Structures are given as structure tokens and as C-alpha cells.
């Protein structure tokens, strides 16, 4: 099933990690990433928590070389993307992996930019901290990142709401888990906590905002 076929389907979830928004549409963070990449000459980009590759494909189309990584195996979808676009592994490559293992996967490789949409909240806070520290050493220009916010609909009945962020990693109530198609435990963020995490891991926050849905987005360098 190619990207146009996927985008014509209802919102889908793969592996209980929420719906794959990127195969349906671009949001404001996706669009800012694409505009940023258009000014570059074949930038090397990481797409972390790529899902079925909606944004990965768009980034290749504007000239980027993309390495997409997701814990769910989207190898078949990415093989189709490569065939449909007549792209090589250098243009678009997919790896199935848990992001906690990213340092082992990438070793000393460097990338120009990285995108991590709707993904960081699936890691406990200490692992999120470690990942962002590693990315600061690996990404030479900008990080475009979003998380599910405490003020989102997901956070309304979130049982970890009053826990310190270091211990805030819990599953949603069964009804909410089914509604949002999120079966994995999550660490939801308040805006000030998200900003603090980015800064303490070495990132300069150029812009940060809360979406109409209560999710948090940032552009960092």
C-alpha cells in the first residue's frame, strides 16, 4: 500500500503507539521542517518515530537523505516508498529499532537535522533525557520535536498527572487507551517541563508552542 493509499484510509494505529498522523496530513511542525530543508543541499535527516513514512517521503521529495527509525516494523511500507519514488537506500532508509538503542545504531554518524514527532513521551523521563543528550552530539543543525502535552485530551484523566516527572510513566486508563489507540505507557509533559528538558540536554530552544489540541512543539538548535 503506497502513501496515497494509506492517506485515504481512516486514521490508523500501529503497535498501540497512537494514530499515525503523518500518513494523513502535515502539521505546522512538519511544514516548518520541510521549509527548513528546502534551502539545503541533500541534508542528512533523522526521522525518529517515523511511523509508516508520511513525513519521511515528503522530506525526500524536497531533497533530503532520510534515515527513518521506528520500533514497529514498517519495512514493507518503506520498500514501497523507495520503489514508487525510484529512490535508493541513500535517499530513504528504514531501520526497525527502539530509540533507547540509537547510540549503538548510529555510532559516530552525524546528521544535519532531526525530526521526532509524537514519540518522546513513549520513553521514561531519564531515557528521554539520555536520548536528547545523544542527539545534541549527533545533530549538527536543528531538531524539530513534539510531545503529547498534559493539557491535551490524553492528559484529562491521566493517572500520572500528579507524579514527579522522573516517576511519571504510566498507562492510560483502558477507555482512554482505546479512544486514543495508545496502549504503551507514556510520560506526558507540561510546557515548562518540556522546555526545561530541552535546555538541560544542551538544546537552544528557538521556538516552542502549544497546539490547539494541547500538544507541545519546539524547534531547537
Question: Language model features by range: what are they?
Answer:
Residues 129-141:
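A short glycine-rich, Lys/Arg-flanked "PGG" loop and its adjoining helix->strand segment in the class I
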Residues 115:
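A conserved beta-strand element that flanks and buttresses the S-adenosyl-L-methionine
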Residues 1-43, 51-104, 143-221:
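Class I (Rossmann-like) S-adenosyl-L-methionine-dependent methyltransferase catalytic domain
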Residues 118-119:
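Short catalytic micro-motifs in class I SAM-dependent methyltransferases
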Residues 47:
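Class I SAM-dependent methyltransferase core
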